[in-house]
From Swiss-Prot:
Protein name: Large ribosomal subunit protein uL23
Annotated family: Belongs to the universal ribosomal protein uL23 family.
This protein's UniProt keywords: Ribonucleoprotein, Ribosomal protein, RNA-binding, rRNA-binding
Superkingdom of origin: Bacteria
GO (cellular component) term, any one: cytosolic large ribosomal subunit
A GO term, aspect molecular function: structural constituent of ribosome
PROSITE patterns in UniProt: RIBOSOMAL_L23 (PS00050)
Pfam families: Ribosomal_L23
InterPro entries in the cross-refs: Nucleotide-bd_a/b_plait_sf, Ribosomal_uL23-like, Ribosomal_uL23/eL15/eS24_sf, Ribosomal_uL23_CS
GO BP term, pick one: translation
Subunit relationships: Part of the 50S ribosomal subunit. Contacts protein L29, and trigger factor when it is bound to the ribosome.
Function: One of the early assembly proteins it binds 23S rRNA. One of the proteins that surrounds the polypeptide exit tunnel on the outside of the ribosome. Forms the main docking site for trigger factor binding to the ribosome.
Amino acid sequence: MIREERLLKVILAPHISEKSTVNAEKHNTVVFRVAIDATKAEIKAAVAKLFEVEVESVRTLVSKGKTKRTGGRTGRRSDWKKAYVTLAAGADIDFVGGAE
């Protein structure tokens, strides 16, 4: 069993983009930015507990940080992990939470 404290630290933010919006509409998939050391099992448990939905599958990828220049100095952005979470049929996560 994964501790609740760890589950709260796994999901950092939803990742909203054109691609993630199309995935949400066509394949019932939600995209999250997650902790770099998070496992698929932790991500699945965190989404199920925090949003009270049933998760079918989790796919992950690590996006490498870009090298950026500021004046004469070069720096590097941090690597980050993205998770594509496929929800069960009929399940939905509403990030906007607009008034009905």
